[in-house]
């Protein structure tokens, strides 16, 4: 593990004391960082300062300082590109390969809408994929006369290689593009992405990654994964303000890639210009992304933060399943900062309506925010762990579930 920066908080101080850095409601047990993130106070202040700066002279900032629209002499250092360059370094990609988008869904949609699907082609997804993305893929496939196929990945899972083998069996001669997750949303699994991407490449299938839950939660080196596109959020585990996402494309995939909203840059031949300006919008979440990276590096220490969150995730799974007398088989290599564990057997096979009722009761009666899901004939809780969480939060969750009927 790399040494902590001199200003970083010692890992022993992670836990409830860290709530001083976040604007979370007092008294709440927040075990749902993964859904939309929580922005640290210092990053919110950085964003507020950016908004103040913009409003002092909006036209000058948006037209002359934010980026080069081709309408004025280019600024020496366009602010948006400067922020994107810092994020690119964090994710291990070249500066010309990364653009900001509102969220991972926007990035995935841009790729799917730009991809040259023909009638009879196939988009391959998996059954752990985020529902909104699956619906978008189905819509685009229908519009092009293509089909959407889904591969069943194991859950519960015992071996990451089982995911690779399932994917290999699902690829057909018609498969043109596969949509893979880096970290699955409901089931909270870190997939063996490099191996799954290699299986696709060997069969001539392009790979689009939904990395919504990855940056900040696990080590991300996009260039080493061997994928064609990677869409991600920075407002979840990387502490940026909402909404802040990124999209990376391999060099040979950039020329034909276009944003969902076309504007001045569409005839420029410059994909960066196309994505950087899609019309007037609030750029402050994107420009505040470097402040979020600074918070991770200089205040928390990236490795210390991930180490705490990962260890607490494993402890959560062990403690909750022992308390509820359930089993949990996920390999440690497939765990990041979240775990999805089964609720007690007395809740039965469950259904989405029961899951929603239990989630509402946990929040309204016990001030615990945690998703409850219905899957594989059981009810589960997905527990997200961040530096402000500690074992007592899990004890409160266990006791609250015991009180549910």
PLM region spans:
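Pyridoxal 5′-phosphate
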Residues: 1-405
């Amino acid at each position: 593990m790399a040494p902590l920066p001199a200003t970083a908080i010692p890992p022993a101080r992670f836990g409830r004391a860290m709530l001083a850095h976040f604007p979370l409601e007092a008294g709440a047990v927040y075990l749902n960082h993964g859904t939309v993130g929580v922005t640290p106070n210092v990053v919110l202040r950085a964003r507020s300062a950016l908004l103040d700066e913009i409003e002092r002279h909006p036209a000058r900032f948006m037209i002359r300082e934010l980026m080069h629209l081709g309408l004025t002499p280019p600024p020496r250092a366009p602010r948006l590109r400067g922020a994107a360059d810092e994020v690119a370094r964090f994710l291990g990609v070249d500066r010309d390969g990364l653009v900001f988008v509102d969220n991972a869904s926007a990035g995935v949609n841009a790729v799917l809408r730009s991809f040259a699907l023909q009638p009879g082609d196939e988009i391959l997804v998996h059954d752990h994929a985020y529902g909104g993305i699956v619906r978008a893929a189905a819509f685009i496939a229908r519009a092009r006369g293509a089909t959407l196929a889904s591969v069943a990945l194991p859950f519960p899972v015992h071996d990451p290689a089982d995911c690779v083998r399932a994917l290999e069996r699902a690829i057909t001669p018609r498969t043109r593009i596969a949509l893979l997750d880096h970290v699955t949303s409901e089931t909270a699994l870190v997939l063996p992405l490099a191996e799954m991407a290699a299986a696709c490449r060997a069969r001539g299938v392009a790979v689009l990654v939904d990395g919504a839950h990855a940056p900040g939660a696990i080590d991300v080196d996009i260039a080493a994964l061997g994928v064609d596109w990677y869409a991600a959020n920075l407002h979840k585990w990387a502490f940026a303000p909402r909404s802040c996402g990124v999209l990376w494309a391999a060099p040979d995939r950039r020329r034909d890639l276009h944003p969902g909203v076309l504007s001045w840059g569409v005839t420029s031949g410059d994909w960066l210009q196309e994505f950087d300006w899609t019309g007037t919008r609030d750029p402050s979440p994107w420009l505040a992304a470097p402040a979020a990276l600074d918070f991770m590096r200089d205040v928390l220490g990236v490795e210390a933060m991930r180490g705490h969150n990962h260890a607490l995730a494993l402890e959560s799974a062990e403690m909750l399943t022992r308390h509820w007398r359930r089993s949990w088989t996920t390999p440690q290599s497939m765990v990041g900062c979240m775990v999805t564990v089964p609720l007690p057997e007395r809740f039965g096979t469950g259904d989405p309506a029961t899951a929603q009722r239990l989630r509402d009761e946990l929040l309204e009666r016990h001030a615990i925010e945690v998703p409850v899901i219905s899957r594989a004939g059981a009810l589960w809780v997905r527990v997200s762990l961040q530096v402000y969480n500690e074992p007592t939060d899990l004890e409160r969750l266990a006791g609250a579930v015991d009180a549910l009927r």
